[in-house]
Amino acid sequence: RASFVLYPKDQGVYISARSLGEVNVQVIVEALGGGGNSTTAGGQLNVPDIAVARTALLRAIDEYFEK
């Protein structure tokens, strides 16, 4: 169980991720250029809008669970 928040700021979209420990959000957020640890992670995506960021996040989540 994990949650992800995307929000526009400055010249990109920020991501904040939290996990109860079952999902390593660090791995998912690192795939998007961010960082953190297994239960908390975040970063900035240099994308034009939230729709593009959402697509990238969903792709990273899919890749995480395919491993």
Residue map of PLM features:
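Gly/His-enriched, cation/cofactor- and phosphate-binding structural elements
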Residues: 1-67
